């Protein structure tokens, strides 16, 4: 079923998504309020609940992200999710929904949405089609000069850092699920400032999330904004070069000496390789390769 628990999609986005899924062999339903304008938080919640309760629906495909899916998650009972487990597909603001799915113990798919069929490079399109058909990803990504090598495994969680920050301390905070669980953290964003990145890593440290992270996959930091007047790096040992430099040095100064892969093709660019959240993933980082597999 097509839903949009975040921002209101256009009719074109809904049509493109429906047609694309149909060409892949799926029967597509459209939730009643997906194009309702204006609509309310309750309308978005009703679409989500309707999809969960509909026994003919096997997956909830989010048409777009945007803002405020957390409002819907605030209304959603984790017990309801557990009672009606369904696949969830989306990314960006849908990270709040992924967090709730994880707390409920249900895997979900971090993937592009309507952009799959009009704004994504073909290898990513094909990878998404394979994952929806049941093939688990096995990727080799290019190395980055600031990568920290190592081989680790853990349950993959995360997504958009700004949205994930908003989930901290909520009933859908992914760190609430199974205190003994170890994670691989996925982290990407668009339009993020250096201060935002510092805030995310600091809060993830304070709530104890980073202490349970075995490794980090940083996706693209699209349109990243340096803040030289506030966070120049002069108080952290010298000027920061970019977002990757900020993250690497903050993790080091906080005592997290774990494998980290930077600038993986996941996020808001033309490349957004899909991933399966809530499942054990293996991360093998060497000087020449980043191998991510299940």
Residue ranges and their predicted role:
Residues 179-243:
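Internal helical hairpin/lid segments
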Residues 56, 81-87, 106, 213-214, ...:
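A short helix->loop->beta-strand "cap" motif at the edges of active sites that frequently abuts
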Residues 107-172:
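Conserved anion/nucleotide-ligand pocket segment
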Residues 66-83, 99, 230-231:
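Short Gly/Thr/Asp-enriched flexible loops that form oxyanion-binding sites at enzyme active sites
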Residues 78-100, 107-114:
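Short, acidic/small-residue loops that bind anionic groups at enzyme active sites
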Residues 218-294:
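ATP/nucleoside-binding phosphotransfer catalytic cores, i.e., glycine-rich phosphate-binding loops
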Residues 1-56:
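ATP/NTP phosphate-donor binding region
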Residues 8-13, 20, 155-187:
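Conserved beta-alpha junction segments in alpha/beta enzyme cores
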């Amino acid at each position: 079923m097509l839903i949009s628990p975040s921002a209101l999609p256009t009719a074109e986005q809904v049509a493109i998504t429906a047609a694309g899924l149909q060409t892949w062999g799926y029967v597509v339903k459209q939730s009643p309020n997906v194009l309702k304008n204006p609509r309310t938080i309750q309308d978005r919640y009703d679409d989500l609940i309707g999809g969960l309760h509909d026994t003919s629906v096997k997956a909830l495909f989010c048409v777009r992200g945007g803002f405020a899916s957390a409002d819907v998650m605030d209304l959603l009972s984790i017990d309801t999710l557990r009672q009606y487990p369904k696949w969830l597909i989306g990314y960006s603001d849908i990270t709040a929904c992924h967090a709730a799915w994880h707390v409920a113990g249900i895997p979900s798919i971090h993937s592009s949405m309507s952009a799959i069929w009009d704004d994504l490079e073909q290898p990513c399109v094909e990878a998404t089609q394979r994952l929806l058909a049941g093939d688990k990803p096995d990727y080799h990504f290019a190395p980055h000069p600031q990568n920290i090598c190592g081989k680790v495994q853990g349950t993959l969680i995360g997504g958009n850092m700004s949205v994930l920050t908003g989930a901290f301390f909520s009933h859908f905070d992914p760190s609430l699920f199974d205190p003994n669980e170890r994670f691989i953290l996925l982290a990407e964003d668009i339009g993020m400032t250096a201060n935002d990145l510092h805030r995310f890593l600091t809060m993830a440290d304070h709530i104890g999330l980073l202490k349970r992270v075995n490794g980090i996959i940083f996706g693209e930091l699209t349109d990243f904004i340096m803040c030289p007047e506030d966070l120049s790096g002069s108080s952290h040992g010298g000027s920061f070069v970019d977002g990757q430099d900020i993250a690497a040095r903050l993790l080091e100064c906080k005592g997290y000496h774990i494998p980290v892969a930077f600038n993986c093709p996941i996020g808001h660019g033309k490349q957004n390789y899909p991933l399966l959240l809530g499942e054990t993933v293996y991360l093998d980082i060497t000087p020449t390769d980043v191998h991510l597999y299940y």
